[in-house]
Amino acid sequence: MTIEYATQYRTRSLIPPEPGKPYFIEKGMGDRAHLFGDLVTIYAGGEQTENTFNFFTCEGPRGDIIPAHSHADTHEVFYVTQGAVRLFVEDLAGEQYEKLLTSGDFGFVPKNCPHAYRMERHHTQIVGVAAGPGGTFERFFERLGTPTDELTLPAQPFVPEPAKFATVPRENDVRFLPGHEWRTGS
C-alpha cells in the first residue's frame, strides 16, 4: 500500500510531512526536481528528521561544473553510486583539493568550505547527505529548479529565472561564490 501526502512543497508526495513516522519509498519515487540537466530525488528531509539531516540522489549527464558554493551551517556528503564525479573542495585554511570519485567512492565537505563538482560521465548518480545545526537544504533543488513527476533526466535543461538566484540560495543555506577559482589544474 502506498500512502500519498500533501505537503507545503507539493500536492502529492510519498514522504510524510512530519517527523516520527516510519516510511518506505521505492527507488526513484521520492520528491523529484529538475535543475539544469539533472534529476534530484529527495527521500528524507528536515521535516522528517527534525532538521538533523537529509538524504537525496542527484543524477545527471557529463557536463559543466556546478558553480563554487558553500553552506554556512551544513556538512555535505558525496557518495558516488554510478559514474564519476570530480569534487573540488577548499578547506578553511585555503588549501584546495580535487578528487575524481567513481562508483563506491566517498567525499566529505565540512560546513563553510567552498566546493564544486562536475559529473565526468553520463549516467552519473550521487547519493547526498547533508546535516548541520542550521537545518538542511534539500528543498533548494525544487525551489530553484522545477518539481517533476518524471523519473528521467529533463529532455531540455531547466534553467531557473535569474531572480530566483537572488533569494532561493540564501533561504536554503547555499552561498554561491562568483569568481571563485580552482587552482587544482582541472
Predicted features and spans:
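A short, N-terminal "cap"/entry segment at the start of jelly-roll beta-barrel domains
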Residues: 1-53, 155, 159-186
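Short acidic-glycine-tyrosine-enriched beta hairpin
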Residues: 24, 48, 52, 91-111
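Ligand-binding loop in jelly-roll beta-barrel domains
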Residues: 103, 111-138
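A short beta-strand-loop-beta hairpin characteristic of the jelly-roll/cupin
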Residues: 72-103
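Histidine-centered metal-chelating micro-motifs
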Residues: 65-67, 86, 105-116
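A hydrophobic, small-residue-rich beta->alpha segment in the mid-to-C-terminal subdomain
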Residues: 138-156
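A glycine-rich, hydrophobic loop/mini-helix early in the fold
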Residues: 36-79, 88
